[in-house]
């Protein structure tokens, strides 16, 4: 007897609960407590996207009283709330159970394999190379010269004519280790992490009698 099942699910994520509450009425200095500007757009709303995660899974089971086989595969694909952040994950599971010698001997073997690749994960709880630091620290309403956050979003890099390369464009001297243009980090300093995991399990059980095995 064989049984096949397929399941799929999709979830949507928003960054509503992790965003600090900002004041958008005073600007002019880095501490964001300058003159009253009668309100300013909250650019953090435009920075975060709607995350989408889709999981598809397929399983197959078949067998008889003497032997049972089970196989499953699951695929996860997600796009995070920060631009460029994504996750791909594959899970494989195979299990075989067999009975011998009039069900006195049972052999159970299982293998579980996982492959995962993540792109542009934000640093959790850290300052360095974290795009959220520049996003949250940027002065409300813009900086000297009338340059607001959208200007640095659209012009995160500028040409260094002397070296003929593109430099980071940020209101703090091209950025520091602790605060940089978020879009420079996302587009020019991407990160990727890959994980592999394989688990093997084998058990052999022999039943001598009803009391001992």
Where do the language-model regions lie?
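Short, P/G- and charge-enriched loop/turn segments at secondary-structure junctions
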Residues: 43-47
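Outer-membrane beta-barrel transmembrane strands
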Residues: 49-68, 73-76, 182-213
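Transmembrane beta-barrel architecture of outer membranes
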Residues: 53-55, 87-93
């Amino acid at each position: 007897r064989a049984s096949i099942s397929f399941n799929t699910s999709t979830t949507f994520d928003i960054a509503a609960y992790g965003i600090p509450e900002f004041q958008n009425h005073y600007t002019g200095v880095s501490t964001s407590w300058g003159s009253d500007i009668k309100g300013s757009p909250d650019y953090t709303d435009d920075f975060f996207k709607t995350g989408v995660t889709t999981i598809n899974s397929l399983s197959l089971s078949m067998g008889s009283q003497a032997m049972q086989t089970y196989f499953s595969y699951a695929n996860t694909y997600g796009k995070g709330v920060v631009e460029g952040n994504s996750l791909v994950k594959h899970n494989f599971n195979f299990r075989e159970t067999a009975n011998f010698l009039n069900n006195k001997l049972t052999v159970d073997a299982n293998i579980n394999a996982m492959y995962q690749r993540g792109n542009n994960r934000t640093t959790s709880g850290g300052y360095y190379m974290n795009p959220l630091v520049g996003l949250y620290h940027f002065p409300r309403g813009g900086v000297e010269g009338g340059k607001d956050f959208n200007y640095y979003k659209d012009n995160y890099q500028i040409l260094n004519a002397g070296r003929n390369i593109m430099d980071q464009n940020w209101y703090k001297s091209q950025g520091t280790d602790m605060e940089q243009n978020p879009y420079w980090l996302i587009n020019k300093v991407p990160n990727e992490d890959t994980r592999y995991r394989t688990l093997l399990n084998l058990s052999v059980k022999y039943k001598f009698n009803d009391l001992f095995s």
